[in-house]
Amino acid sequence: MINKDSLTHHISQQFNAELEDVRSHLLAMGGLVEKQVNDAVNALIDADSGLAQQVREIDDQINQMERNIDEECVRILARRQPAASDLRLIISISKSVIDLERIGDEASKVARRAIQLCEEGESPRGYVEVRHIGSQVQKMVQEALDAFARFDADLALSVAQYDKTVDREYKTALRELVTYMMEDPRAISRVLNIIWALRSLERIGDHARNIAELVIYLVRGTDVRHIGLTRMKEEVENNRGE
């Protein structure tokens, strides 16, 4: 089992510093992505095209952070040939940055929908769903990053479990909005923008779950992807304290 103290156990202080640096860079990228998601949701709800444009402009910075962290991981793998928990840390970081970058992409899509809705003027049906699901996925991203920062497999498990709730509520919202469009065809264009924004939010939840699963792999040493929530819970609880 890995914890924060594990990062300081190497004879080489330089290796300790390299591991802590790349982990810190991941969390810094995560903080920026988390802000991007929050701002995208607020831009959509508040019809703030200026804030939406800021979200889209951050995308290049996030992409550059992904490339930089990838390079750090490659250098550590080549120079240090890490094993055991160190190797799991590098693998988890290198995969998590992919999900963070994709969360940023989805936030940018939400911002684009916000700009389009601002241009159309009239507020469409669906903002209640955006506010609700947006709040849920914001919490998932925040807690997935907190779990990574604290090496907390239990918190990571709760993020993965919560993804089912988001998926269920997304499907419910989708049915309601499709019904609304059938009743008022004049609203189709506007409501479609809301539907696509909700789809991006649902995908953000999926990527937050991916990061949570990587935290469990990092801390417990077990790959829990594709095994279902019941077995995932068993793996986390059975390996607790090892």
From Swiss-Prot:
The record, for PANTHER family, names: PHOSPHATE-SPECIFIC TRANSPORT SYSTEM ACCESSORY PROTEIN PHOU
Q: Which Cys pairs are S-S linked?
A: none
Q: Which UniProt keywords apply?
A: Chemotaxis, Cytoplasm, Phosphate transport, Transport
Q: Annotated Gene Ontology MF terms? A: protein homodimerization activity
Q: Which family does it belong to?
A: Belongs to the PhoU family.
- Originating species: Pseudomonas aeruginosa (strain ATCC 15692 / DSM 22644 / CIP 104116 / JCM 14847 / LMG 12228 / 1C / PRS 101 / PAO1)
- The coding gene here is phoU
- Name of the featured protein: Phosphate-specific transport system accessory protein PhoU homolog
Task: Give its localization.
Answer: Cytoplasm
Q: How does it assemble?
A: Homodimer.
Q: Which NCBIfam families does the record match to this protein?
A: phoU_full
Is-annotated flag, keyword Metal-binding? no
Q: Name one GO biological process term.
A: cell chemotaxis
Q: Main role?
A: Plays a role in the regulation of phosphate uptake.
| GO (cellular component) term, any one | cytoplasm
- Any one Pfam family here would be PhoU
Phenotype upon knockout is:
Mutants are constitutive of alkaline phosphatase and show chemotactic response to phosphate regardless of wheather the cells are starved for phosphate.
